[in-house]
């Protein structure tokens, strides 16, 4: 299997993107493993992950949460494939979700990991949104819910699954 993606998504007609930088308490190796092998530890519903950390290999996972307070929880499938993997440094993957996310568009998430004296600087770029509304909603979820929750779970101060958006 090639270590290069067979096709990188064309994002030219979907110019909206987001960038989030955050200091994480976990070290780069712990974060790399979490993003490539342990989605069900911090993000996905338990037992709802099919993922092999190899370039070009498709993955699938589900999250489960209520979209609005007081409504029943629903399942939210996520699909993708790894585009680039550099252990303990970089993860790049495609990210496809439904309504309230990428609306079926194949977007690209790039996670860059830089070691710090205590922890890691994580830079997340998520590109390929059709409009600013989808970008803004996804940015808020990454910034306010998902990444803080990941930091808590990986350092032993939180539990999975993550809180609802």
What does each model-found stretch correspond to?
Residues 1-50, 54:
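Hydrophobic ligand-binding cavity/cleft-lining segments
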Residues 2-4, 128-165:
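A conserved amphipathic terminal alpha-helix motif
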Residues 19-20, 37-75, 162-165:
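Short beta-edge strand/loop motif at the mouth of beta-sheet-based domains
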Residues 22, 77-84, 107-114:
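Hydrophobic/aromatic beta-strand elements that line small-molecule binding cavities or substrate pockets
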Residues 31, 59, 82, 91-93, ...:
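Hydrophobic pocket/interface hotspot
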Residues 75-78, 91-96:
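Short, conserved beta-strand/beta-arch hydrophobic-aromatic motifs that form part
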Residues 86-91, 118:
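Short, conserved beta-turn/loop elements at beta-strand boundaries and strand-helix junctions
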Residues 94-100, 125-132:
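Short, solvent-exposed aromatic-acidic interface loops
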């Amino acid at each position: 299997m090639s270590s290069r993606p067979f096709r990188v998504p064309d994002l030219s007609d979907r110019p909206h993107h987001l960038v989030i930088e955050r200091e994480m308490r976990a070290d780069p190796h712990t974060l790399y493993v979490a993003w490539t092998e342990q989605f069900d530890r911090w993000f996905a519903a338990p037992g709802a992950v099919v993922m092999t950390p190899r370039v070009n290999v498709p993955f699938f996972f589900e999250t489960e949460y209520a979209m609005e307070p007081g409504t029943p929880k629903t399942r939210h499938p996520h699909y993708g494939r790894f585009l680039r993997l550099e252990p303990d440094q970089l993860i790049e993957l495609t990210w496809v979700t439904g309504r309230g996310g990428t609306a079926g568009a194949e977007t690209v998430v790039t996670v860059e990991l830089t070691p710090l004296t205590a922890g890691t600087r994580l830079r997340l770029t998520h590109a390929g949104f059709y409009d600013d509304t989808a970008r803004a909603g996804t940015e808020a979820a990454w910034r306010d819910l998902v990444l803080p929750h990941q930091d808590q779970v990986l350092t032993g101060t939180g539990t999975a699954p993550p809180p609802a958006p």
